[in-house]
Structure formats: structure tokens, C-alpha cells
A protein has these predicted regions:
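A conserved beta-strand-loop-helix scaffold within acyl/acetyltransferase catalytic domains
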Residues: 11-17, 22-40, 46
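Short, compact, well-ordered microdomains
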Residues: 78, 82-90, 94
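Conserved acetyl-CoA-binding loop-helix of GNAT-fold acetyltransferases
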Residues: 53-66
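Conserved N-terminal entry element of GNAT/NAT acetyltransferase domains
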Residues: 1-10
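Generic alpha-helix structural propensity
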Residues: 42, 59-60, 79
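Conserved GNAT acetyl-CoA-binding A-motif
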Residues: 66-82
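Conserved catalytic-core motifs of GNAT/GCN5-like acyltransferases
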Residues: 95-104
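A short, internal acetyl-CoA/4′-phosphopantetheine-binding micro-motif in the GNAT/acyltransferase core
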Residues: 45-52
Length: 104
């Protein structure tokens, strides 16, 4: 099984994506959209079969939510992806320092 750390996560603002690449070339990713009304909507998460059940989705969720919330404190970070909503509810204590995270 591959191991990942924070340096494994790539943020690509031009495509509004956070991702982790596997050796096979597959990617786990989270898409977001910067809206005109001072919000950032994290709307989609996808993990390839080889990454399911490994915790990579949660790792990617935590990193992307925290990074966007910290870098955009004057904007509201909206979690409209059902996976991210579930992850956030289950791990709310990790995000207590971020007052700009909301559920869709």
C-alpha cells in the first residue's frame, strides 16, 4: 500500500482541484468552485478503487478544507459534496479554528 503525507497533496488553483496521484497514475481528487458571492464551494470528491478504504479520502478532505478555509478567511467555504459533509460532521473537532466553514 502506498503512503501519503501533506506533501503528496497537490493544489491546482487553475482547475480548482486538490489531488493525490497514485503510482498507477490514478488520482483521488476534490473539486471546488470559487463563486462570485465570496464563497468557495467544495462540490465533488472522487477516490479511485485502489484508494478506497485506505483513509486517503479523509486525508484529502481534511487538507483541502483546512487549506481553503485558512487561505480565504474572508470567504465562506461551503461543503456541498455529501462525502465532505459526512467527513466534516464526523471530524468537526479538527475544524474548530475555522469559523468560515458551512454546510450547503
Amino acid at each position: 500500500m502506498e503512503t501519503f503525507n501533506e506533501d503528496s497533496v497537490v493544489h491546482e488553483p487553475s482547475t480548482e482541484t486538490f489531488y493525490i496521484s497514485f503510482k498507477s497514475g490514478a488520482k483521488a481528487f476534490i473539486n471546488y468552485k470559487v463563486e462570485k458571492n465570496d464563497t468557495i464551494d467544495l462540490w465533488h470528491t472522487e477516490v479511485p478503487d485502489e484508494g478506497r478504504g485506505t483513509g486517503i479520502g479523509g486525508f484529502l478532505a481534511s487538507k483541502s478544507i483546512k487549506d481553503l478555509a485558512a487561505a480565504n478567511s474572508s470567504k465562506t467555504v461551503i461543503l456541498s459534496c455529501s462525502y465532505l459533509q459526512h467527513y466534516y460532521k464526523k471530524n468537526e473537532a479538527k475544524f474548530v479554528d475555522f469559523k468560515n466553514i458551512k454546510m450547503a
